[in-house]
Amino acid sequence: MEMANDKVAETVIVGNYVEMESEGKPPQDIKSKLSNFLWHGGSAYDAWFSCASNQVAQVLLTLPYSFSQLGMLSGILFQLFYGILGSWTAYLISILYVEYRTRKEREKVNFRSHVIQWFEVLDGLLGKHWRNVGLGFNCTFLLFGSVIQLIACASNIYYINDNLDKRTWTYIFGACCATTVFIPSFHNYRIWSFLGLVMTTYTAWYLTIAAVLHGQVEGVKHSGPNKIILYFTGATNILYTFGGHAVTVEIMHAMWKPQKFKAIYLLATLYVLTLTIPSATAVYWAFGDMLLNHSNAFALLPKSPFRDMAVILMLIHQFITFGFACTPLYFVWEKTVGMHECKSLCKRALVRLPVVIPIWFLAIIFPFFGPINSTVGSLLVSFTVYIIPALAHIFTFKSSSARQNAVEQPPKFVGRWVGTFVINVFIVVWVLIVGFGFGGWASMVNFVHQIDTFGLFTKCYQCPPPTPSVPTMPPHQMNATAPSPHHHHH
């Protein structure tokens, strides 16, 4: 690294952030110290917690299902591969953010009560068509991200208390999640993201240890990968796992020194890999092909206090992740209605309510936990998180003057601008073909199959069939996530 250049860049950037830092130090009495510690987070650690905890939530439970579709080796390789791709695009987003912010602050724009979002970065650097595309994909993705959290809540609690069916649980959790309208911004998620990380860590190790202690099921088969359709569905679910950074810009904005963000995302991803690889491998090793019909890993493990604990922790975590996915939507909505700069919390909370209602509704229509992850992954994450940032980076720095005046030069080990350009083009092509093309096709076929099998407003997705005294559908149709041999779709 050329130290001199870095030093200059750093002073330029730090110069702009001085005012933000001085804001971040209110007078310290005990009460404000405590509220600061629990509530107002903007340090590098907070960003790390937010990234890591935001990345893993319910995906831990669907990864073994992906492994059963992909086979062991592909599963591990895809995780590493998409982990690296994800960190790279997060790095691009952070560069574009710092670039946008520095340009704006040279024009003396003040961002005190305004949260910068991804679409504004696109707007400022590339104009309004980019903004509209970015906004469209991002909002749809976050909308469905929130929907998935709701479905996951219902899907999980069912394993503790099955007196109510999953749809009723979705109603209940929808009402609970609506309370996130009262959390003003990402600064206020400090204690939550820390707890979230503790919870996912516990769950991941619970899955690993429980699966190993349980040992392999009799006659366990590991036949994956056998169907091309399932292979790509699984791969896309992994793409979705490491595409958790549609919220990257908002998390960065909540930091006091956003330029530290680049390394943080990579570290978060590395930590996440230590959770996802052991747990998915262990569960797949123990249960093999049984996972093809159980997209939620909790379904196969024996009931125990530890499992109940893991389920409860995941529930609390989903609540937090719901807040994470929804907060940017609230911001966009506030800006549309013109209430974003408003000081009164209650007014803003009221304005935000219409955002929660469609999410609630969608979660009741499509309760397919597992297949919906892959569908969202292929159709939305592929663009929001991989293709758009890579293209935006190419177009922002395509003129040589823009490259010379860039606040931050690309690192030497990737080969400066040429290397960066090559990597970006590779990402765009790869994700378009494998993620969006094959992945989209496979996920949509799988998704439509779920609708054909279960119907839209299905009451209880993948629940064990009721007692045999009532004539029911044959069991293989009740819980088919993979097309069963009786009815092939070609």
UniProtKB/Swiss-Prot annotation:
It is found in: Cell membrane. Residues 74-75, 154-168, 212-227, 284-310, 374-376, 442-490 are extracellular. It is a multi-pass membrane protein. Coiled coil: none annotated. Pfam families: Aa_trans. The keyword DNA repair does not apply. The chain crosses the membrane at residues 56-73, 76-96, 133-153, 169-189, 191-211, 228-248, 263-283, 311-331, 353-373, 377-397, 421-441. The keyword Glycoprotein applies. Glycans are attached at residues 293, 479. Residues 1-55, 97-132, 190, 249-262, 332-352, 398-420 are cytoplasmic. Shoots and roots of nodulating plants, at low levels. One of its GO terms (cellular component) is plasma membrane. It comes from the Eukaryota. Keywords: Amino-acid transport, Auxin signaling pathway, Cell membrane, Glycoprotein, Membrane, Symport, Transmembrane, Transmembrane helix, Transport. One of its GO terms (biological process) is amino acid transport. InterPro entries: AA_transpt_TM. One of its GO terms (molecular function) is symporter activity. Belongs to the amino acid/polyamine transporter 2 family. Amino acid/auxin permease (AAAP) (TC 2.A.18.1) subfamily. Carrier protein involved in proton-driven auxin influx. Mediates the formation of auxin gradient from developing leaves (site of auxin biosynthesis) to tips by contributing to the loading of auxin in vascular tissues and facilitating acropetal (base to tip) auxin transport within inner tissues of the root apex, and basipetal (tip to base) auxin transport within outer tissues of the root apex. May be involved in lateral roots and nodules formation. This is Auxin transporter-like protein 5. It comes from Medicago truncatula.
